[in-house]
């Protein structure tokens, strides 16, 4: 049985259920905290969409409003970023990415839960796949002309080699910066909450006076928690927007 002994355990991946046989190595089928929370996030996303669209009514209930607002926001963002006739082709991808990261971020704010988006290997792998997919899309559409993306219009000929190097490094950095930005923000926020929460707990346990005075730092922690909710939503939107921007660059070379 797996027990959580510290808030920092939300960053650790532990095995919850092992599959052991005397004949085959089934360790790849073990259920870990990572796999469990992936399933939870996907179930929440599917449940939300089923519950809000299952009534088949023209005028939705007030419970439909938040999801419809999210849908319209991502729709307009994708249309504004990618534009043209191809934006609708990539909208399901952008919307799914946004919802997945948003739900994962919000679930990670629950005390003692597992922080999916604080797993740097997972998030950077996801951003690398997005970068690689957009690069392949650009090559498939433009062929060798895709490399013109690394030469800004109007660049003086003597500066072309230098700018090609700079633009190439900048483009390659996208594969990691997209995920690193998300992971660092989530990880920093969670660590701050853990540190402040531990200090507050030690402070209020000193005596009765500190127990009363602890209301002030407790209110500050609640304010930081509200800020973490905002960061969770903002980082989800930033990830989705940058993904759409990378796809646009591959499609239109600008």
Curated annotation (Swiss-Prot):
Keyword rRNA processing recorded: no
An annotated Gene Ontology molecular function: proton-transporting ATP synthase activity, rotational mechanism
Keyword annotations of the record: ATP synthesis, CF(0), Hydrogen ion transport, Ion transport, Membrane, Mitochondrion, Mitochondrion inner membrane, Transmembrane, Transmembrane helix, Transport
Membrane topology: Multi-pass membrane protein
Propeptide residue range(s): 1-5
Keyword check for Transmembrane: yes
Recorded GO CC terms: mitochondrial inner membrane; proton-transporting ATP synthase complex
Main location: mitochondrion
SUPFAM superfamilies: F1F0 ATP synthase subunit A (SSF81336)
Family as reported in the entry's similarity comment: Belongs to the ATPase A chain family.
Main function: Mitochondrial membrane ATP synthase (F(1)F(0) ATP synthase or Complex V) produces ATP from ADP in the presence of a proton gradient across the membrane which is generated by electron transport complexes of the respiratory chain. F-type ATPases consist of two structural domains, F(1) - containing the extramembraneous catalytic core and F(0) - containing the membrane proton channel, linked together by a central stalk and a peripheral stalk. During catalysis, ATP synthesis in the catalytic domain of F(1) is coupled via a rotary mechanism of the central stalk subunits to proton translocation.
Protein name: ATP synthase subunit a
Organism per entry: Vanderwaltozyma polyspora (strain ATCC 22028 / DSM 70294 / BCRC 21397 / CBS 2163 / NBRC 10782 / NRRL Y-8283 / UCD 57-17) (Kluyveromyces polysporus)
């Amino acid at each position: 049985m797996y027990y959580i002994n510290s808030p920092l355990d939300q960053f650790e991946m532990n095995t919850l259920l092992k599959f052991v046989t005397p004949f085959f190595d089934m360790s790849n089928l073990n259920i870990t905290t990572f796999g469990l929370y992936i399933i939870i996030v996907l179930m929440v996303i599917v449940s939300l969409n089923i519950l809000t669209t299952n009534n088949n009514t023209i005028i939705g209930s007030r419970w439909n409003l938040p999801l419809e607002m999210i849908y319209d926001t991502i729709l307009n963002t994708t249309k504004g970023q990618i534009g043209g006739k191809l934006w609708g082709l990539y909208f399901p991808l952008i919307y799914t990415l946004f919802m997945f990261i948003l739900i994962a971020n919000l679930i990670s704010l629950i005390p003692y839960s597992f922080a999916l988006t604080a797993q740097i290997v997972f998030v950077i792998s996801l951003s690398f796949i997005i970068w690689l997919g957009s690069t392949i899309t650009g090559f498939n559409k433009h062929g060798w002309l895709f490399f013109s993306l690394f030469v800004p219009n109007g660049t003086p000929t003597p500066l072309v080699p230098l700018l090609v190097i700079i633009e190439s490094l900048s483009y390659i950095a996208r594969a990691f910066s997209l995920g690193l930005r998300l992971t660092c923000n989530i990880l920093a926020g969670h660590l701050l909450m853990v540190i402040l929460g531990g200090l507050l707990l030690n402070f209020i346990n000193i005596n009765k006076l500190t127990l009363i005075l602890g209301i002030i730092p407790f209110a500050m922690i609640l304010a930081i928690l509200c800020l973490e909710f905002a960061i969770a939503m903002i980082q989800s939107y930033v990830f989705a927007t940058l993904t759409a921007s990378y796809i646009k660059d591959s499609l239109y070379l600008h």
